[in-house]
């Protein structure tokens, strides 16, 4: 059930559906989860300042049932930051990503929980 949400001031029209699809594949591979469970939501065109300027910036979170935490997050961070920098042009020092390990009982899906 990995869910990646990311808000950025990069204009929405500069964020392609192909970028969302490649983000989905990246996350599935990083976490070893079936891509059929991965959800990606990128909120472009947001009013965001970072460090007092409105230069390209963003912040987000990756929620998952397992696969995140501790040293794993260093590797996840490196891969996600490179992907976001390459795809959206946001420098690594103008982003934050929170990694959240969810409990199955706290995640609803298809009328039940995991």
Curated annotation (Swiss-Prot):
Its EC number is 5.3.2.1, 5.3.3.12. It is found in: Secreted. It comes from the Eukaryota. The active site is at 2 (proton acceptor). GO terms for cellular component: extracellular space. Substrate binds at residues 33, 98. InterPro entries: Macrophage_inhib_fac, Tautomerase/MIF_sf. Keywords: Cytokine, Isomerase, Secreted. It catalyses: L-dopachrome = 5,6-dihydroxyindole-2-carboxylate; 3-phenylpyruvate = enol-phenylpyruvate. GO terms for molecular function: cytokine activity; dopachrome isomerase activity; phenylpyruvate tautomerase activity. Its main location: secreted. Belongs to the MIF family. Tautomerization of the methyl ester of L-dopachrome. Inhibits migration of human peripheral blood mononuclear cells. This is Macrophage migration inhibitory factor homolog.
């Amino acid at each position: 059930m990995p869910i990646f949400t990311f808000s950025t001031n990069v204009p929405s029209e500069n964020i392609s559906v192909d970028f969302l699809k490649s983000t989905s594949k990246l996350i599935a591979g990083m976490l070893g989860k079936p891509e059929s469970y991965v959800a990606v939501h990128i909120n472009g065109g947001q009013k965001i300042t970072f460090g007092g300027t409105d230069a390209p910036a963003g912040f987000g979170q990756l929620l998952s049932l397992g696969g995140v935490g501790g040293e794993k997050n260093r590797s996840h961070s490196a891969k996600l930051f490179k992907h976001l920098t390459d795809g959206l042009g946001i420098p690594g020092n103008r982003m934050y990503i929170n990694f959240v390990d969810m409990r199955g009982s706290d995640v609803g899906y298809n009328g039940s929980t995991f």
